[in-house]
A protein has these predicted regions:
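Alpha/beta-hydrolase fold nucleophile elbow
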Residues: 134-145
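Acidic catalytic loop of the alpha/beta-hydrolase fold
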Residues: 214-219, 244-245
Length: 262
C-alpha cells in the first residue's frame, strides 16, 4: 500500500511538472511573439513614407499608393517587428497598386487586447475596410513569416484572387519549436492561441503561391514543402540564397510575385 502511494505521488509530481513546463513555455513564447508587435519601433531606413489609416474607431494601419488607380490591391501581413508602418515603409514601393497593412488590435495604435481572436478580427476588419474603399479591385493577400498564418486565415474567410506566403508554417509549433523544442504531438495541447495555417488552408479556394529559400534558417525550405501539401491547389517556389528577412527586398522574389499576380 505504501509503495503504491509512493508511486502515485511520483506520478503526480511528473504530471505537475509536465503541466508547469508546458503551460509555462507556451506563456513565455506567446509573450515574446506578441512583444514583437506590441513593442516594435518604427524603422527609419524606409524606402517610402507610409500613410496612416484609421480603419475603425479602434483599428489602425498604414498604406501606400492609396490613391493609385489600379485593378488590384495588396493586403500585407508582416512578420516579427514588421508592424504596419514598417511593412509598408520597407516593401510597398515595389508594387504599383494600393499596399495596405494593419496593426492587430492591442498593438501599436490599435486598441484592445492581442490574442488569436483579435488578430483574426483585425484581418477581417482590414479586408472589409479595403473592400469598401476599393470595391472594384481584386484583392491579393500576402504574408511573411508569423504573418502567413493570419494571411491564410483571411483567405479562408474572404474572397481573394491570390494568396502569397513567404516562409510560412503549418501551425505555431513550427515557430515555437525553433526556440524551445517541446511542442510535438500531444504536447501541442499546451499551446494557446494556436495559429493553425494547415487548418485554414482547407478552406482557401484562391490561387496560392508559397515561397521559400534554401538559405532560410528560420522557416526552412523543407517546411515550405510540407506546407504546400496543406492546400488543395498551391504552387511552391524555392530560391537558393535568400535570408529569412530578405524575401520582399530581393528582386528575384519581387519579379516572381509580379509574374503571378499579373
Amino acid at each position: 500500500m505504501v509503495k503504491k502511494m509512493e508511486i502515485a505521488r511520483i506520478l503526480l509530481k511528473i504530471v505537475m511538472w509536465i503541466l508547469i513546463v508546458g503551460f509555462g513555455c507556451n506563456f513565455i513564447l506567446q509573450t515574446i511573439s506578441y512583444s514583437f508587435y506590441k513593442g516594435a519601433k518604427k524603422m527609419t531606413n524606409l524606402v517610402c513614407m507610409p500613410q496612416y489609416i484609421q480603419m475603425t474607431d479602434a483599428l489602425t494601419g498604414y498604406g501606400h499608393n492609396l490613391d493609385r488607380d489600379s485593378d488590384k490591391i495588396i493586403l500585407f501581413f508582416g512578420g516579427s517587428n514588421y508592424v504596419a508602418y514598417n511593412s509598408v515603409g520597407k516593401y510597398a514601393n515595389r508594387f504599383a497598386c494600393p499596399f495596405i497593412s494593419v496593426d492587430y488590435y492591442g498593438t501599436q495604435d490599435s486598441k484592445g487586447k492581442m490574442n488569436l481572436s483579435s488578430m483574426q478580427r483585425s484581418a477581417l476588419d482590414l479586408y472589409d475596410w479595403a473592400k469598401q474603399q476599393y470595391p472594384q479591385s481584386e484583392i491579393i493577400i500576402m504574408g511573411h513569416s508569423y504573418g502567413t498564418g493570419i494571411a491564410t486565415y483571411l483567405a479562408s474567410e474572404r474572397k481573394c484572387k491570390t494568396l502569397i506566403l513567404a516562409a510560412g508554417y503549418r501551425d505555431i509549433s513550427d515557430l515555437y519549436n525553433k526556440i524551445i523544442p517541446i511542442f510535438w504531438g500531444p504536447f501541442k495541447v499546451f499551446i494557446s492561441n494556436n495559429i493553425c495555417t494547415k487548418e485554414y488552408a482547407k478552406a482557401v479556394d484562391s490561387s496560392v503561391y508559397i515561397i521559400g529559400s534554401k538559405k532560410d534558417k528560420t522557416l526552412n525550405a523543407d517546411l515550405q514543402k510540407k506546407l504546400v501539401t496543406c492546400f488543395e491547389n498551391a504552387e511552391i517556389k524555392i530560391f537558393d540564397d535568400i535570408a529569412h528577412e530578405d524575401y520582399f527586398v530581393t528582386e528575384s522574389v519581387i519579379g516572381y510575385i509580379h509574374q503571378v499576380i499579373e
